[in-house]
């Protein structure tokens, strides 16, 4: 084999190592997706007393207006399965934005109403920058449609009035606007009132095709499922 032939072989081997290493690196980075949104553990009475919180500091009921806090603990995101080249099982891609605002009202101790949540989709990030760019430029086209909104279609009546520190569940109907398209969605929410805060978590099953979203393939991703989930954890503080 001449010098030119050897150089070609070396070049092919190097290219294979680079590409193979890239696939392995991508696969290793996507092997551990963050878990779905879940309620934080209920604060203990002892912890509240240690922090100087007393019954006089906290309202007796959660009634009133609440707003999403701005300390970065709230997020709205997505979960979707993507198939990577040369891997047998799909990877669950997860992206989140902590740029979330919104308000809700609690009335009569057991009714949630006037909910409106907005998320800045240009701030969505995952463990892969190429995925994030594909979502911004194609997919969600968040440069063109930067905001997602969720509103209640009607008030949610809880089965029981919330007790401080205890988990409650609520079901209802909302209106989700993504990619310039608004559709009704079924809501199955879990929440916990912890005196000065209320945390609400949930997942909304959606189909990208319902919102005219083209799955944004990139790099080693050969296919993306149409079904996805809007995943969120919202921490509210009293206004």
Task: List PLM regions with ranges.
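Low-complexity, acidic/polar, glycine-enriched regions of mature
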Residues: 2-239
């Amino acid at each position: 084999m001449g010098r030119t032939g050897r150089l070609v072989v070396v070049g092919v081997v190097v290219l294979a190592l680079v590409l193979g290493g890239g696939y392995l690196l991508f696969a290793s980075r996507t092997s551990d997706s963050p878990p779905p949104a879940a309620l934080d553990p209920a604060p203990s009475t002892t912890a509240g007393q240690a922090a100087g919180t007393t019954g006089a500091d906290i309202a007796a009921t959660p009634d009133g207006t609440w707003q999403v806090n701005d300390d970065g603990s709230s997020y709205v995101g997505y979960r979707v399965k993507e198939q990577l080249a040369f891997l047998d099982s799909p990877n669950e891609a997860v992206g989140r934005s902590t740029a979330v605002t919104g308000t809700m009202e609690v009335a009569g101790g057991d009714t949630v109403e006037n909910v409106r949540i907005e998320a800045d989709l240009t701030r969505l990030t995952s463990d892969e920058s190429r995925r994030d760019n594909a979502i911004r430029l194609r997919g969600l086209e968040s440069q063109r449609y930067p905001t997602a909104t969720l509103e209640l279609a009607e008030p949610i009546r809880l089965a029981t009035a919330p007790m401080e520190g205890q988990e409650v569940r609520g079901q209802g109907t909302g209106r989700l606007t993504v990619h310039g398209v608004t559709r009704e969605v079924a809501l199955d929410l879990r929440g916990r009132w912890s005196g000065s805060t209320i945390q609400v978590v949930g997942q909304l099953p959606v189909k990208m095709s319902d919102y005219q979203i083209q799955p944004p393939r990139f790099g080693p991703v050969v296919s993306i499922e149409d079904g996805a989930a809007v995943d969120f954890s919202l921490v509210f503080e009293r206004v």
